[in-house]
Amino acid sequence: MTPTHITSLAFPVFTQGLALGLGLIVAIGAQNAFVLRQGLRREQVATVVLFCALADALLIAAGVLGMAQALGEHPGVARALAVVGAIFLALYGWQALRRARHANALNATAGATGLGQGAALAQAAAFTLLNPHVYLDTVLLVGSIGAQQPAAMRGWFIAGASGASLFWFALLGYGARWLAPWFARPRAWQVLDGLIGVTMFLLASLLLRHALAGI
């Protein structure tokens, strides 16, 4: 198999992981507000960004590889999970489109006390690992979708989904001073939610088609 052929196969898988990762992580939430706040105050930005991105990458890899091994022995369960995943993505997309109809904004100004590296890591860990949605999103949802990919392509899917986390957290942390006024505008989040909704519906249709093709 030539490098060009490998790239042609890997790029759509990488892009799917990237789109899924961005669709799930771009949301109004405590973790994003924390990263943005650290960026605004220029406190422990590298520490917080790297921790959040690395934690996501490890959870995504564990989810994809673990689910792949489990589902490889039960193809029927794999198809069922693909259908469930498609339904979840469609519902997630529908919720995003609903949010796009209402004004909202991200508040990154709460908390005025400066943080040392240890305290910043502790808070980043709490916002990341004590949030039950992180396990639903990264381990179960991303893991089950990534496990549907051919074995040789799973690394590309993991790279895409992990790259989305690194890109988003770096954008929040290092672009905070430019992004904060934009994120404070409800209209910006309405546009983002609209794009997320469309992306989730597209991914749901791809996943459902994959599930039905295996029947």
Language-model regions, residue ranges each:
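Juxtamembrane transmembrane-helix termini in multi-pass membrane transport proteins
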Residues: 2-79, 140-156
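Hydrophobic/aromatic residues within the transmembrane alpha-helices of Major Facilitator Superfamily
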Residues: 18, 22, 26, 57, ...
